């Protein structure tokens, strides 16, 4: 037996061996079926593209506000807390931190709606806390851009309102403390005046009883409380009258407290002047939609249609071959 005979014998004894040429010929003969399946798949894909909801994503990048955006707020903090006021960098970090937390809370709320909305916030650069990338997915590119800008403004206004409310509360507390301090210092000054008048009146009585009319000492600073009567009744009488009509005497601390009170009362922070963020990149107008992807959908339709058509052709031929063997 020749080698060719052995090969033919081996091929005839292996019925499960795949003949690629025969397989291709089967597919070619069933090309009409395959083409029909592809056309049907493309038609279904076109129908899907026509009814599927489009998704467009607008992106913005924000970071902490500039010092100029917080000038009035920072000035108010300096007036309220003086040397204990927080640094500008801490104020900026606090604002953007509140913005990030509020934005995340809003995104979670929108996601839990009956009709969820996709709003997100993440670090723009991996491994860095700032800047922040915020995005919104809408039905059209214009809607996505407009809605993202609205949500950023909404969060910014909310944060500014909260921080201004905290500032107003701090102002009220500071005013109350300063007013109490002034009242206490005024009470002390009144007590000191009353005490001085009482001491002078007592010295006047002693001088009158001792019949001392003229001063008996050369220098007034040498007179103590016990020897004040030595100033004489005439001088003491004038001193009592002058002390009674003289305004209260206050220390430098009183006037500093008074100045602080007036500065706090004059504080006024306009809510519109405070912002919790600064744009690095404003909301974009997307030019490519996220889904459905027309090109990818049509390519997949052709591939899936072709695979289904090929499966139909090969399956039909295999069934015919099985029936022929059975007969």
From Swiss-Prot:
Membrane topology (Cytoplasmic): 1-31, 316-327
UniProt keyword terms in alphabetical order: Cell inner membrane, Cell membrane, Lipopolysaccharide biosynthesis, Membrane, Transmembrane, Transmembrane helix
Keyword tRNA processing in record: no
Stored Pfam families: Wzz
One annotated Gene Ontology cellular component of this protein: plasma membrane
Gene3D superfamilies, per database record: FepE-like
GO MF entry, a single one: protein tyrosine kinase activity
Membrane topology designation: Multi-pass membrane protein
Residue intervals passing through the bilayer: 32-52, 295-315
Primary localization class, coarse: membrane
Protein family membership: Belongs to the WzzB/Cld/Rol family.
PANTHER family xref list: CHAIN LENGTH DETERMINANT PROTEIN, TYROSINE-PROTEIN KINASE
Protein name: Chain length determinant protein
């Amino acid at each position: 037996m020749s080698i060719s005979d052995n090969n033919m014998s081996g091929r005839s004894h292996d019925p499960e061996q795949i003949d690629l040429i025969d397989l291709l010929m089967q597919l070619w003969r069933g090309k009409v079926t395959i083409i029909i399946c592809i056309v049907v798949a493309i038609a279904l894909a076109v129908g899907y593209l026509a009814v599927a909801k489009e998704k467009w994503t607008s992106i913005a990048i924000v970071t902490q506000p500039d010092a100029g955006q917080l000038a009035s707020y920072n000035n108010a903090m300096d007036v309220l807390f003086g040397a204990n006021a927080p640094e500008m960098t801490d104020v900026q970090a606090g604002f953007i931190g509140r913005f990030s937390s509020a934005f995340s809370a809003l995104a979670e709320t929108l996601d839990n709606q009956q009709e969820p909305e996709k709003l997100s916030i993440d670090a723009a650069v991996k491994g860095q806390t700032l800047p922040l990338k915020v995005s919104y997915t809408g039905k059209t590119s214009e809607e996505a851009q407009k809605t993202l800008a609205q949500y950023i403004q909404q969060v910014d206004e909310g944060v500014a309102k909260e921080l201004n409310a905290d500032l107003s509360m701090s102002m009220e507390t500071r005013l109350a403390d300063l007013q109490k301090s002034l009242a206490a210092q005024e009470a002390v000054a009144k007590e000191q005046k009353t005490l001085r008048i009482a001491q002078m009146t007592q010295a006047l009585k002693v001088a009158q009883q001792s019949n001392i009319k003229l001063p008996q000492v050369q220098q007034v600073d040498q007179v103590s409380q016990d020897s004040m009567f030595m100033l004489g009744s005439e001088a003491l009488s004038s001193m009592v009258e002058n002390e009674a009509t003289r305004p209260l005497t206050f220390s430098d601390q009183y006037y500093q407290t008074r100045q602080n009170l007036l500065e706090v009362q004059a504080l006024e922070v306009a809510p519109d002047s405070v912002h919790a963020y600064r744009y690095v990149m404003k909301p974009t107008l997307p030019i490519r939609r996220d889904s459905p992807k027309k090109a990818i959908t049509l390519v997949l339709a052709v591939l899936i249609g072709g695979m289904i058509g090929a499966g139909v052709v090969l399956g039909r031929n295999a069934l015919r071959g099985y029936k022929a063997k059975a007969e």
